[in-house]
């Protein structure tokens, strides 16, 4: 029993750690609500075929990183490695029309068998935002701006936006033919991993971290040179609109998102706050995905943010938790019953209530309230129980007028008046 522990690449998030997580999530969800983006929840477990068709068999995610197994019905199942394919499947399966515009978000655990490191785990958490049915340049800009605003709102420093265009299907097809011809001549100079990608997923060679291969690729054909006039115009419009919105960016023509379903706009947001440029957000347009998976042709664009890395980068102030408003000190059987009943009533207000369940002496309970920096305390002992009342007072601010009061358990009006006065609660309670 003593040897039982979590799997490598998974982490227990304990209450103190979760304070920052919850604060970060709250800020994100408030911003998404204001942007009229609605939540969607899809299963963590999906049929393996979904990701093979949606992400692409030649990707590292599918070929190396997925957690896949046969269930008791001999069906191949996979713990989701990302969220976009599941959203696309849900759109198709639930008969959502291609003409129905959807702004969706999801947040939850994903699974990839990677080498664990700071900000990257095998079970990791991801925020995803998907705009389904939108094909205008404006939607590309809105999705980039939304991702940028989330990161800025969280106080993340040294942000850099990199953009590229992957063109449409024909652009990529024409480029790939030229690139494969170039690879025939230069493949032996590439690193082994890049050579293996030639057959499976040649565009992913541009993702290489190998310095020598990067240098060689500088002489390779550029996808940008194969863009149609329409694709080029779209890309120019995106750059112009980003400039007007004062969102700084740099062009990175080697930026190829790691999944096969991307078209046109591709972008990444990185931060140098951890000492090196770490990718915080990645996204792009995927107009072919839903059609590729058996649905009708539906344009879409989205992004994903890894929460583990986001937590590392987010501001220190987000580690602070809301302090206890009222600590209920109680001692004696009848007092304990009254304290439980009162705590239930107080939870109807926008206050943090801590009910002491220890049965310890009053002095020890006072020390606990002080340690928690509670703004006020309620005292219920045998005397208060006999009088059917409780004492409430500000804990460390006795100079405030009306800082203390004795209130009957039935006198809700007097209780609300004291709470409104000392906690500045909504006067319409």
From Swiss-Prot:
Q: Which UniProt keywords apply?
A: Aminoacyl-tRNA synthetase, ATP-binding, Cytoplasm, Ligase, Nucleotide-binding, Protein biosynthesis
Per the UniProt entry, what are the Gene Ontology biological process annotations, in alphabetical order? Answer: histidyl-tRNA aminoacylation
**Localization per record:** Cytoplasm
Q: Name one GO molecular function term.
A: ATP binding
Keyword Ion transport (UniProt): no
A single Gene Ontology CC annotation of this entry is:
cytoplasm
Give one Pfam family: HGTP_anticodon
Q: Does the keyword Aminoacyl-tRNA synthetase apply?
A: yes
Catalysed reaction equations from the record: tRNA(His) + L-histidine + ATP = L-histidyl-tRNA(His) + AMP + diphosphate + H(+)
EC number annotated for this UniProt entry: 6.1.1.21
Q: Which family does it belong to?
A: Belongs to the class-II aminoacyl-tRNA synthetase family.
Q: How does it assemble?
A: Homodimer.
**HAMAP family per record:** His_tRNA_synth
- Can you name this protein? Histidine--tRNA ligase
């Amino acid at each position: 029993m003593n040897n039982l522990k979590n799997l490598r690449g998974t982490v227990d998030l304990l209450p103190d750690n979760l304070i920052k997580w919850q604060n970060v999530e709250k800020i994100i969800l408030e911003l998404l609500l204001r942007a009229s983006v609605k939540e969607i929840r899809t299963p963590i477990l999906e049929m393996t075929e979904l990701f093979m068709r949606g992400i692409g068999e030649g990707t590292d995610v599918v070929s190396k990183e997925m957690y896949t197994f046969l269930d008791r019905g001999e069906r191949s199942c996979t713990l989701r490695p990302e969220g976009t394919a599941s959203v696309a499947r849900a759109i198709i399966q639930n008969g959502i029309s291609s003409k129905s515009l959807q702004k969706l978000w999801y947040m939850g655990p994903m699974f990839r068998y990677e080498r664990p490191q700071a900000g990257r785990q095998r079970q990791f958490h991801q925020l995803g935002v998907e705009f389904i049915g939108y094909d205008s340049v404006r939607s590309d800009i809105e999705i980039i701006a939304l991702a940028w605003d989330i990161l800025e709102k969280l106080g993340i420093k040294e942000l850099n936006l990199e953009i590229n265009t992957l063109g449409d299907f024909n652009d990529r097809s024409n480029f790939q033919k030229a690139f494969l011809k170039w690879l025939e001549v230069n493949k032996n100079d590439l690193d082994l991993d890049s050579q293996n990608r030639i057959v499976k997923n040649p565009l992913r060679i541009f993702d290489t971290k190998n310095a020598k291969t990067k240098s060689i690729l500088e002489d390779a054909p550029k996808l940008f040179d194969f863009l149609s006039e329409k694709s080029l115009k779209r890309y120019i419009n995106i750059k112009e609109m980003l400039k007007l919105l004062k969102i700084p960016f740099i062009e990175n023509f080697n930026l190829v998102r790691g999944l096969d379903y991307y078209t046109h706009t591709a972008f990444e947001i990185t931060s140098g706050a951890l000492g090196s440029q770490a990718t915080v957000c990645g996204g792009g347009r995927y107009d072919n995905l839903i059609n590729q998976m058996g649905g009708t042709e539906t344009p879409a664009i989205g992004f994903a943010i890894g929460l583990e890395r986001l937590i590392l980068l987010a501001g220190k102030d987000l580690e602070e938790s809301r302090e206890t408003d009222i600590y209920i000190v109680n001692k004696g059987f009848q007092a304990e019953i009254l304290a439980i009943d009162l705590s239930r009533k107080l939870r109807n207000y926008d206050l943090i209530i801590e009910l002491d369940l220890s049965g310890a002496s009053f002095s020890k309970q006072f020390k606990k309230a002080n340690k928690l920096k509670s703004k006020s305390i309620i005292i219920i002992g045998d005397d208060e129980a006999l009088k059917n009342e409780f004492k409430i007072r500000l804990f460390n601010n006795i100079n405030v007028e009306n800082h203390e009061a004795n209130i009957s358990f039935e006198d809700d009006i007097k209780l609300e008046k004291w709470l409104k006065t000392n906690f500045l609660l909504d006067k319409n309670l």
